[in-house]
């Protein structure tokens, strides 16, 4: 090593970015490598999400559709095969109501329960719920049970 080939130790220096906009003598003065005029040359520039250079953005070109019905009721569905499974496991015997749905985590206490017709119900049950589908009501009554609306 001699004075003609001095260099910093390995890993002691980091790639420092060139300081721009600090006078013509620095080599990066004037426009500070931003080019001439335009939005990108201005201070505080950041491209807005969805901005397409002034072209009408996709989000505004596509038509709007649909709406959220504020009066919509959200039902928690319980199928007949689930009720039959509870009977087979000995959890319920002759009747099932909201307290049973809550106890078996099929619905929470504030939810509206609707009995749906998937599966087969063999047990004679008195089912108490907020709503029934036509097929579910028919299946409960065909098994000798009773469908009671709250």
Curated annotation (Swiss-Prot):
<keyword id="KW-0687">Ribonucleoprotein</keyword>
<feature type="compositionally biased region" description="Polar residues">
    <location>
        <begin position="1"/>
        <end position="15"/>
    </location>
</feature>
<keyword id="KW-0694">RNA-binding</keyword>
<keyword id="KW-0699">rRNA-binding</keyword>
<comment type="subunit">
    <text>Part of the 50S ribosomal subunit.</text>
</comment>
<feature type="compositionally biased region" description="Gly residues">
    <location>
        <begin position="23"/>
        <end position="32"/>
    </location>
</feature>
<dbReference type="GO" id="GO:0003735">
    <property type="term" value="F:structural constituent of ribosome"/>
</dbReference>
<dbReference type="InterPro" id="IPR001196">
    <property type="entry name" value="Ribosomal_uL15_CS"/>
</dbReference>
<dbReference type="Pfam" id="PF00828">
    <property type="entry name" value="Ribosomal_L27A"/>
</dbReference>
<dbReference type="GO" id="GO:0006412">
    <property type="term" value="P:translation"/>
</dbReference>
<dbReference type="GO" id="GO:0019843">
    <property type="term" value="F:rRNA binding"/>
</dbReference>
<feature type="region of interest" description="Disordered">
    <location>
        <begin position="1"/>
        <end position="53"/>
    </location>
</feature>
<comment type="function">
    <text>Binds to the 23S rRNA.</text>
</comment>
<dbReference type="GO" id="GO:0022625">
    <property type="term" value="C:cytosolic large ribosomal subunit"/>
</dbReference>
<protein>
    <recommendedName>
        <fullName>Large ribosomal subunit protein uL15</fullName>
    </recommendedName>
</protein>
<dbReference type="InterPro" id="IPR030878">
    <property type="entry name" value="Ribosomal_uL15"/>
</dbReference>
<dbReference type="InterPro" id="IPR021131">
    <property type="entry name" value="Ribosomal_uL15/eL18"/>
</dbReference>
<comment type="similarity">
    <text>Belongs to the universal ribosomal protein uL15 family.</text>
</comment>
<keyword id="KW-0689">Ribosomal protein</keyword>
<dbReference type="InterPro" id="IPR036227">
    <property type="entry name" value="Ribosomal_uL15/eL18_sf"/>
</dbReference>
<dbReference type="InterPro" id="IPR005749">
    <property type="entry name" value="Ribosomal_uL15_bac-type"/>
</dbReference>
């Amino acid at each position: 090593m001699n004075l003609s080939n001095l260099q910093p130790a390995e890993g002691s220096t980091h790639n420092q970015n060139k300081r721009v906009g600090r006078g013509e003598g620095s080599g990066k003065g004037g426009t500070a490598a931003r080019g001439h005029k335009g939005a990108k040359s201005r201070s505080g520039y950041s491209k807005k999400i969805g901005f397409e250079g002034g072209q009408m953005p996709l989000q505004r070109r596509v038509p709007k559709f649909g709406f959220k019905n504020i009066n919509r009721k959200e039902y928690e569905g319980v199928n007949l095969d689930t009720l039959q499974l509870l009977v087979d496991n000995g959890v319920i015997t002759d009747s099932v109501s909201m307290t049973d749905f809550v106890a078996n985590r099929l619905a929470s206490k504030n939810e509206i329960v609707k009995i749906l017709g998937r599966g087969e119900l063999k047990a004679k049950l008195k089912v108490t719920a907020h709503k029934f589908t036509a097929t579910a009501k028919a299946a409960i009554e065909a098994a000798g049970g009773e469908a009671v609306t709250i």
